[in-house]
A protein has these predicted regions:
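Flexible, acidic loop-helix segments that line cofactor/substrate-binding pockets
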Residues: 193-211
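Extracellular/periplasmic bilobal clamshell ligand-binding domains
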Residues: 205-224
Length: 224
């Protein structure tokens, strides 16, 4: 068994090793990282209303984030609010780099996961302005409203964390291990893990795991 995330999948597909999700047996998806949009604590964008006002005024807004899932969910956000021409998306190698650029005033907004940004929110350097999730995050990220609260459709693209096995594993064994991992997610220790690393619960059964991993692969390959 091997821990396997959507980021691992993208790295694998970008490499020259020639492997795809089809070479493995997806077992379970356990949890997910979701994203928020952050602004400087005392910057011009204190809320989504400030972002919308800048768009309505014809301003260009510079946003930083990574090339993978953060860009995917940001594109969904832009499409939902109908403002494709209002943003310049600047690529960074990591969330830490884009957060640093935000604090330095090089960009107006940045994408980021709870784990990557929480320390900077607690220190008062940045603030969350939009939660790209179906519900608000826990404190100290809870001041950011969801898109649904703002009057739009929910926007989210969870970066899943899961488990895979060799492609030769039998169907019976795959079902067994999915059940084992489901039991893990029902323990207090697992809830403590989610809380520690600011992850969202996102357990998927065997069929859903296969579907999600395959679709993530197909979508990523189509975007290249």
């Amino acid at each position: 068994l091997l821990c396997f995330s959507s980021g691992d999948m993208q790295n694998m597909l970008d490499s020259e090793i020639g492997l795809t999700v089809d070479d493995f047996a997806p077992i379970a998806i356990m949890a997910a990282d979701k994203q928020l949009i952050f602004a400087q604590k005392d910057g011009k964008f204190a809320s989504f209303d400030d972002i919308k006002a800048a768009i309505d005024n014809g301003e260009k807004i510079n946003v930083g984030g990574t090339k993978s899932n953060e860009k995917t969910v940001f594109d969904m956000f832009v499409e939902e609010i109908g403002a494709a021409d209002s943003f310049n998306y600047m690529f960074y190698d990591s969330s830490a780099e884009s957060i640093t650029a935000l604090m330095g005033g090089h960009i107006d907004l940045c994408m980021g996961s709870p784990a990557a940004a929480v320390n900077y929110v607690e220190s008062g350097d940045i603030k969350p302005v939009v939660a790209l999730s179906d519900e608000r995050f826990n404190a100290p990220l809870d001041e950011a409203p969801t898109m649904e609260e703002l009057g739009y459709n929910t926007v989210q693209s969870p970066m899943w964390r899961g488990v895979i096995a060799p492609g030769s594993m039998s169907e019976e064994a795959q079902e067994y291990w999915n059940g084992v991992f489901k039991a893990v997610t029902e323990t207090d220790a697992w809830q403590d893990y989610l809380n520690t690393y600011l992850l969202s619960p996102y357990f998927q059964d065997l069929d859903s795991t296969r579907e999600i991993m395959k679709k993530a692969q197909d979508d990523y390959l189509a975007s290249k």
